[in-house]
């Protein structure tokens, strides 16, 4: 069975960016394991389950899976995960990743081994793309020269204030686009497109929540996974 590891933030993951790929992969009979930095259950960003923000259907779906999914409620510690055990590693986004996953040494190791090694593939979504700015391979940035998309500055401007404070009062540590560009990535968030998913070798990146479904389908294609046969 094809296996996947979801590395999810304890400081606020964006619901759709985790739940859409997770449920899609499971519907295609992939085995899913969830890891968090400390092994505590991940925390959903409340803005991503606000019906006024994301719509009632999405909000209800995310809450239902968040509350009842066995792996989300009993994750493994990130330090115990090894890339060789999985065919793909998924890094859902959310501003919370900037405080834990993106700067976690074990997350960087997993990403590096999946993308630069032979252990599998990686799907990195939205703010989690910032992880690429902190991941090095042979002394250089892993993302150097690679085509990527991610959460753009233009969108961030509509969320934080002039002091980079978020609606919940936290100060954003950095802007994803700025950091990933500084790591010499070939950045294009395709702002004129409805969705944005980019494939560069074993690295798949997705722009944001609206690209989550396409990102999941792209990962399935890259893994050569076909839809399960009807009973």
What are these regions (language model features)?
Residues 1-120, 130-231:
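Extended, subdomain-level signal for the structured scaffold at the beginning of enzyme domains
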Residues 124-128:
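Short, thiol/selenol-centered motifs that function as redox-active sites or metal-ligating centers
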């Amino acid at each position: 069975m094809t296996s996947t590891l979801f590395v999810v933030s304890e400081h606020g993951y964006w619901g759709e960016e985790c739940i859409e790929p997770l449920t899609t992969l499971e519907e295609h009979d992939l085995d899913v394991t969830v890891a968090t930095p400390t092994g505590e259950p991940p925390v959903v960003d409340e803005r991503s389950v606000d019906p006024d923000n994301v719509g009632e259907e999405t909000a209800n779906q995310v809450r239902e899976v968040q509350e009842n999914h066995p792996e989300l409620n009993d994750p493994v510690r990130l330090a115990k995960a090894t890339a060789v055990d999985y065919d793909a590693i998924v890094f859902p986004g959310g501003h919370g990743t900037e405080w834990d996953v993106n700067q976690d040494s074990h997350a960087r190791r997993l990403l590096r081994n999946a993308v630069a090694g032979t252990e599998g593939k990686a799907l990195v979504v939205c703010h989690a793309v910032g992880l690429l700015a902190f991941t090095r391979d042979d002394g250089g940035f892993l993302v150097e020269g690679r085509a990527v998309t991610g959460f753009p500055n233009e969108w961030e401007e509509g969320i934080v204030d002039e002091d980079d404070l978020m609606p919940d009062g936290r100060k954003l540590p950095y802007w994803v686009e700025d950091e990933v560009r500084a790591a010499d990535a070939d950045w294009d968030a395709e702002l004129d497109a409805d969705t944005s998913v980019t494939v560069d070798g074993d690295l798949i990146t997705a722009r944001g929540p609206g690209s989550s479904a396409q990102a999941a389908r792209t990962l399935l294609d890259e893994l050569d996974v076909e839809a399960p046969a009807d009973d």
